Amino acid sequence: ITGYLSTAGGSTAEETAGNEEDAAGNEEDAAGNEGDITGNEEDEDAGQNEETAETVRAYGFELSDQSGNIHTLEQYEGKVIFLNFWATWCGPCRNEMPEIQKLYEEYAAQGEDAEVAILGVAGPGMGGEGSAEDITAFMEENSYTYPVLMDETGEMFSYYGISAFPTTFMIDREGNVFGYVSGQLTEDIMRSIIDQTLAAN
């Protein structure tokens, strides 16, 4: 998985705090790195130093989804979390949502024994996004049923330093950030990053 694990809750989040436009990003940025999990030289260096990198705790969220259900980080303890940040106006986001729904249905069918939780995150009113009601209507119109957390304050977007859509973070079983990928993902890549995170601990 590409990405500097130590920046997820550090300077990147601080630089983007309160900046809704940066948090929203744009479709070109999101599509520019579609599913690249190979990274560049800097990413490779980061991977080599992964063992010595500081562990970054996942954001301790308590947010409601499109159905009004409350979700917390603690309730997913012991599970890997596939955390997908997206927007209704984002073309690459729309393109990958059927695959995310497919994975959600697959893991949901396993019930309490499922090792993986699939969650979306949207920012109502941020960067051109509509209201929570608009996001819910979009999900219903497209028959998407996986939970989408409504980050009304933008705190979760800020913590993870979201600057383009879609961006997917993987959270390990211990509630720590394993890594992230920016750009549209294929189903194969989604399964690959899930497997990588499952194997981590």
Language-model segment annotations:
Residues 79-80, 95-122, 140, 187, ...:
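Conserved helix-turn-beta segment immediately C-terminal to the redox Cys motif
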Residues 170-201:
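Thiol-/selenol-based redox modules, centered on thioredoxin-like
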Residues 61, 76, 85-86, 138, ...:
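Conserved hydrophobic/aromatic "anchor" residues
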